[in-house]
Amino acid sequence: MATFSQKPAEVEKKWVIIDAEGLVVGRLASIIAMRLRGKHKATFTPHVDDGDNVIVINADKVVFTGKKYSDKVYYWHTGYAGGIKERTARQIIEGRFPERVLEKAVERMVPRGPLGRRQMKNLRVYAGSNHPHEAQQPVALDVAALNKKNVRSA
């Protein structure tokens, strides 16, 4: 029996919606990255974009474990000499674009390259509970029910 290799024309993408309220960032990002890549499907092919379209709502209500909320630091460089910048997870979540914490976590779990960039375009993250994708009839994915450690008990 030959190894199965999916063709791009045979790919069937589903729409999945995830409510991120109270979910742990890293665990949620891992599940989202797996969905975006298509590794949850039996038809997974490494060089084909056969993952699902993922919508995440309430991304501003994700939680960190331990002291990461105040201690985790995100770095970037402006390109100028001495231009290293940093911001904590707390500053980002309380700032203007809190959904970037989750986007960055998922981005770092997806392979870098042309295919990874195309798969990241299938991710839509919204800080609030509203999203413009009702017409796609997304199926709800209950991440909290998959494992009790996915939810932070306060």
From Swiss-Prot:
Q: Which InterPro entries does the UniProt record give? A: Ribosomal_uL13, Ribosomal_uL13_bac-type, Ribosomal_uL13_sf
Q: Which domain of life is it from?
A: Bacteria
Q: According to its record, what are the GO cellular component terms?
A: cytosolic large ribosomal subunit
GO molecular-function terms, A-Z: mRNA binding; structural constituent of ribosome
Recorded hits in PANTHER family, A to Z, give: LARGE RIBOSOMAL SUBUNIT PROTEIN UL13M, RIBOSOMAL PROTEIN L13
What is the annotated role of this protein in its UniProt record?
A: This protein is one of the early assembly proteins of the 50S ribosomal subunit, although it is not seen to bind rRNA by itself. It is important during the early stages of 50S assembly.
What is the name attached to this protein's record? Large ribosomal subunit protein uL13
The record lists the lineage as: Bacteria, Pseudomonadati, Pseudomonadota, Alphaproteobacteria, Hyphomicrobiales
